A protein has these predicted regions:
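HIT superfamily nucleotide-processing domains
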Residues: 1-119
Length: 119
């Protein structure tokens, strides 16, 4: 997809701090980190999200990359979180499948903020 920023990063058309790459995926530091370690794992082929007929081999490559990133950054020893937002209501802002790998601090117990009584 020619206007997709993650496609451009995967194709080395725009600069990024790449921390892992293989034939199927690229992993790079998030430009707006939400934790001391915040890496995005992205397939090189464009898929809108995790339910976009993604081949099992690509998902396996993504999970493998998560493990490599966790090990290489040391968050495999302290704990980390993996998130794949799917759709606008879930907070997906770039519609190219990606996994967030977050760690390097105490991320707390909850996955999302508790709803307020007004919600």
């Amino acid at each position: 997809m020619s206007d997709c920023i993650f496609c451009k990063i995967a194709n080395h058309e725009i600069p990024s701090t790449i921390v892992f790459e293989d034939d199927d995926v690229v992993a790079f530091k998030d430009l707006n980190p939400q934790a001391p370690v915040h890496v995005l794992v992205v397939p090189k082929h464009h898929y809108d999200n995790i339910i976009d007929d993604v081949p099992a081999s690509v998902l396996a490559a993504m999970v493998h990359a998560v493990g490599v990133v966790a090990h290489d950054t040391g968050i495999d020893r302290t704990g980390f979180r993996v998130i794949a937002n799917t759709g606008d209501a879930a907070g997906q802002t770039v519609h190219h499948l990606h996994m967030h790998v977050l760690g390097g601090c105490d991320l707390g117990e909850g996955l999302v903020p508790a709803p307020t009584e007004e919600a």
